Amino acid sequence: MGKLNNTKEAQLEQNLIDLLCAQHGQWTFRSDLKTEEDLWNNLRNIIEIRNKSELNDNMLTDSEFKRIRSEILANTKTPFEAAKWLRGEKGKCSVVLERDNGLGRIELIIYSSIEKNGGFSSYEIVHQIAKNKSNLEERSRRFDITLLIGGLPIIQIELKTAIAKDGVKQAYYQIEKYIDEGTFSNTIFQTLQLYVMSNEQTTRYMAAAPKGELQDKFMFGWRTRDNTRVENINEFAKQVLNIPRAHELVSEYMILSEEVSSKILMVLHPYQIHAIEAIFEAASKHQSGYIWHATGSGKTITSFVSTKLLAQKSGIDRTIMLLDRKDLDNQTTSEFTKFASAYSTGVNTNKNTLIVGTGNTKELSNALKQDSSSNVVIVTTRQKLNKAVEYLQEKEPGRLANLRGKHIVFIVDECHRAISAQNMDDIKKVFPKSTWFGFTGTPIFEENKKSSDGQYARTTHDQYGEVLHRYTIKNALEDGSVLGFQVEHEYTIHQDEL
């Protein structure tokens, strides 16, 4: 092991700020912003610039901004609530404001998830923001580095030196202390979505969490697309904290898991992100392929997020996630709808709808023929899809003929169990412009290919095309993203008989 760098924290922080600002001028360091009140005033200025036409040259009064400030705090009590609110309607978060002096009611955009490296999005860095204690029990705090998107604190970076006790865990404990003390609560820092922790040599990231729910097992290290580990904070910053990557990470690759008893903000592993982006690239070229990810590494979540995000991409008319019939029965509708809080889940809605399963053939066929701009996501089985297609062939052949010319993307979880090569060929005849992406932990290669069945594909490559991303069991064990093996040697012949 080489000699560890003893760079003091202050210099480490300054080096990181300089690096972020040097990346094509994407981030701007705001040395003039020193306190929370400075951040609120900066946000007010950004809101006024963004909404200049709506304000009609009548800038916000103090009382108007006080109401906006109160609404932001009311909607961001937890990181989950903040994430849900920031996503807003079609990626834009807004507030409705009744203007003073009888100027009427207007809607102001506060934050955008879709204006990445463009539009009115701004990217600013603040350093050592002071949080003064509000009572005798509290302690005054200063936060290392905070990244503002659209004026709101979104990413908090906590740095320790390479010689710090417990390494990167020391930075984690600092974040944990902030949360336990309520340091972020009732402040503009309630909008934080992501924590980055580093001791310079080791860097981890994780989704923001409320008091009592932060767990170090959800700290993830970064890997490149070819699975090279990225540990150093400077290399991590180049790859993950650049624009638009940082904005994409918090807007597209964070998941809202919502159940009656639990509301959790989650962030994807790097291998999940790389797989999704590889699918995007292939789909844009109408090329199929498959993802080889280790069993137990979260393929179903990856495939679902792929399906959801593809539905929002231009050039794609419909996305359908296919599962094995037993998997859909076992996982049930709620397993998917808990990750789709931004969607309606009723089969009778026409826009922004998640449809899971549905035993009603007519309902599924109606979903298939929705307009491509409707952002409908379908999760179903090959058997139910076949019945829906048969229904359209019999009842609405004209509608089915229209679908033949559409770019339909199929995401297939456990791609050899969910659909056979023959079934897939049959569906391709109905949807000739479709592209297919399979997920598997156990690809079929030439050496273990299926027995001959006429002209049908016998390997994963033959059925789906090139492998688009790999994350093997070796990688997964290194990261701790799957459980290790317990090996026990059992003898079939008693030792005395050998």
Regions picked out by a protein language model, each given a short descriptive name:
Residues 294-295, 414-417, 430-449, 480:
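Conserved helicase ATPase motor motifs in RecA-like P-loop NTPase domains
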Residues 358-378, 402:
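Conserved motor-coupling elements within RecA-like helicase/translocase cores
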Residues 332, 388-393, 415-425, 449:
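Conserved ATPase-coupling elements of RecA-like P-loop NTPase cores
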Residues 2-318, 327-343, 372-373, 383, ...:
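ATP-dependent helicase/translocase motor core
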Residues 195-198, 378-381, 410, 435-440:
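Structural recognition of the conserved hydrophobic beta-strand(s) that form the central parallel beta-sheet
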Residues 232, 449-498:
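Interdomain helical connector at the RecA1-RecA2 junction of SF1/SF2 helicase-like NTPases
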Residues 149, 284-287, 370-374, 390-408:
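Short basic/glycine-enriched coil/helix segment immediately N-terminal to the Walker B
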Residues 399-437:
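SF2 helicase catalytic motif II
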